[in-house]
Structures are given as C-alpha cells and as structure tokens.
Amino acid sequence: KPEEDWGHR
C-alpha cells in the first residue's frame, strides 16, 4: 500500500 511505500523515499 502507498503508506508503506514511503520507506523507499
């Protein structure tokens, strides 16, 4: 999900 995806920024 997008919220989890913040870790890649």
Curated annotation (Swiss-Prot):
Expressed by the skin glands. Keywords: Secreted. It is found in: Secreted. GO terms for cellular component: extracellular region. It comes from the Eukaryota. This is Skin secreted peptide P1-2. It comes from Phasmahyla jandaia (Jandaia leaf frog).
